[in-house]
Amino acid sequence: MKSLQADFFKVMKEGAIQYAAPLPFLDLICVGTATQTEVKEQIDLMYSLIHQQVDVIVLVPIDSKALVQPAVEAVRKGIPVINIDIQLDAQLLEQAGVEVAFVGPDNFAAAYEVGKLLGKKLRNEDKVAIIEGLAVADNARQRKRGFIKAIEEKGLR
């Protein structure tokens, strides 16, 4: 996971632990970084899991490009990778000839819908400020693009 300090990922971890608890055939290993900016540490965690020869890896990448290589190596060693929340770079995966399942939102579309809703509530002369997430996070970039597209279509700035 990304940061095990972030509330979102604390809840995700707790949910996974609760789900796995009654399943005797499932040995769950939850690992994550201390912050949402520790890309190298997350890469190291991925290689550690590969070295442990786990059966499957569920990955929430901090950086959608930097985590492609460890994901590719896992798949090539027979370890399926399920990518959740922030999608790994599809172009890099394609270049590597590897498929990774993705489960998560369409961040562009979600932010576009929020922008459209806001556009209905504001006047053209109103100004909108955007407070972004991490610039390295692809989901943050997608959300920004979707939101800006919607408000620009409404003539807001």
Over which residues does each language-model region extend?
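A residue-level marker of the well-folded mature domains of exported/periplasmic proteins
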Residues: 1-157
